[in-house]
Amino acid sequence: MQWNEIDKTISKTFEFNSYLDGIDFVNEIANLAEQENHHPDIKIGYCKVTISLTTHDAGALTEKDYKLAKLIDDLKT
């Protein structure tokens, strides 16, 4: 599944075998976000995690968003 671009945001939903697998993934993303100093919006559901990226201070998508999206995708491979 690819990232979906809507307005000034890209988002993607990841599915997991268990709720805790999703939580582990969110923790990995949190560490990555701190390293990159770029923080996504995260929605946690049952066996699903939705990540949304935008550069708030720019009011638009920037290279930071696409870079973090790639790094997040790399966590799942």
Model-derived regions: residue spans:
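C-terminal structural segments of small proteins and small subunits
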Residues: I51-T77
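Short aromatic-glycine-(Arg/Gly/Cys) micro-motifs in beta-strand/loop hairpins
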Residues: M1-T9
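A short N-terminal helical cap/helix-turn-helix that marks the beginning
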Residues: A33-K43, K70-T77
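Short, well-ordered beta-strand elements within core beta-sheets of diverse protein domains
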Residues: I10-N17
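Short beta-strand
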Residues: N4-E5, I42-I44
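Solvent-exposed alpha-helix faces
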Residues: N27-E28, K70
